Amino acid sequence: MPFTAQTIVDQLQVLIPGVTDAEALGYVNRAYKWLLGSTDIKTEPLEIASVQYQQGYDLSNDILRTDKVLWVTGVDDQSRYTGDELTFTPDKEFINVSYGTPTDYSFYNSRQSSAATTDSKAQIWLYPIPDIDPDGGYPKIVIYGAVYRALTLTDSLSNAVQFEDAILARSKQLLFDDYDPSKSDYWEQKAAKYLRETLDTLNKRQDGLGENLIPTISYSRRTAQ
């Protein structure tokens, strides 16, 4: 089944107990408006018309590389959304994907060297979870990141925290080749610590970038020790 807005609504209602249809659709709508530059709730599948991967990586495989993170630059005023597909202009890519090393300011340097939009407010840092739509639609982590951002921009901060915790809990089941719950605490704590520290660092920045970069989860694909 294609990954649609309703799919996200259904999953939000599982992840956030008690959230209503209207609330969930509101989160999805805000996420889509930010991600697509669209004012409409889109219930049809999202399809990628073309995406350029700077280092040639395919999100459907090899999504996790040890000590690497995924960053995505988002929309700007010249981006276009047509029907069910995202379209790109040659000099203003709607979405730009690359891997980088997670140092304190690597995202800043990556943005400077990117061929995509120079608008700092269009960039979002996403740490990948290998939970990709098998039907070829939008990578779920991109949508989750946008929904997470929508949650943080509303007054439902407690919902955002629940959503964050739910993603963290889900991710540990996805990232270990031979998952063993009894051995996963170290990796879960490491990811949670990194997430909190990164959010704290971004919140303290004075250049206006912090509020526009919403980290989610970071793991390395290693067998739990």
Spans of features found by a protein language model:
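Glycine-enriched, solvent-exposed interface loops adjoining structured elements
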Residues: M1-Q225
